[in-house]
Amino acid sequence: IPEHNWTRTHAGLFDVSHMGPSFFALPKGHGLEGDEAHKKVASLIERLVPADIQGLKPGQVRYTMITNEGGGVLDDLMIARPAEPGAAGDLYIVVNAGCKHQDWALIEEATKGEANLVRADDRCLLALQGPNAHVAAAAVIDPALAEMNFMTVKRYDAFGRITVTRSGYTGEDGYEILVRAENAADLANALLAHAEVKPIGLGARDSLRLEAGLCLYGHDLDPKTSPIEADLAWTIQKRRREAKDFPGAKRILREYELGAAKKRVGVRPNDRAPAREGVEIMKDGKTIGVVTSGGFSPVLNGPISMGYVEAAHSEPGHVVDLMIRGVPRSATIVPLPFVPHKYHRPKKGA
């Protein structure tokens, strides 16, 4: 809990090197330039995901999912378009640790040698998260980091050569930094020497992402659950909805138009008993859903859960029962996130 609270008020440094960072690029000598090269490489990855990757501007990052033909989710991931000269036709992709070998195989199979997937196995991924992450990053790495917008990517000649996205999975402002393994300890130690930064473990990372209402693959997302059920319709941009050309489009677009039978929601138990994954959600003695993530919220000083319920019961304010050890306990459906996001976005009119 102290680690969680420190990240919400200062800045926490996480080692997330178990994730799956990689680079996906057109073959050398592809002969394409600028937007043309980007559209080509993006069209290849769009065979797997429903997001508009061709529409990424230089330096932009997008959250998306790999979907299957049944409209379920095989993984969620970040895809970035590096802006540097010479990066035309390159994408930077970060997938989840537990799915990385499956994802890489899917990418290679779907793109059949039309582009090269290079795993960043020789690098470490560090996440610096919290309201003062920008202060430490600017002081230790480069003052320009403070000016980066949320969901953008940039490369810096510091600590070797690093790739930085202003992103993360805590609901706070922050960065994810890809650094060569031989430079990682120097970077981590330099950040930890800053008064605002402390090392944070993966237990706090999970409670932070739960407060932020963010999905954990294998729990809140799985091969049977669609992006629409998961309340992630915003990740499917208009061009892809109109083209209807991604895996699972039939089911996903039907649910997009008509609504899904179930929906991911926030659940606040009305007492102190935590409801963890697998707990049934009941209404009038009937099972209407299940908890997929649950735990204690240090910010709210009480238990919180996410889960899926029948759409008819998904509106905030609905009172439900959680079957905890065979005893029904009252809870309320609430909006997500539990704790407001504090991402760094450009000021209006700036």
Label the predicted regions:
Residues D15, D76, E176:
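Acidic active-site catalytic centers that drive phospho-/nucleotidyl reactions
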Residues R81-A350:
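Conserved, structured C-terminal
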Residues H10-G12, G20, R62, D75, ...:
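A generic secondary-structure signal marking the coil-to-beta-strand transition
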Residues R47-E109:
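Well-ordered mid-protein domain cores that form the structural environment of catalytic cofactors
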Residues I1-T64, G72:
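Acidic, proline/glycine-enriched N-terminal capping motif
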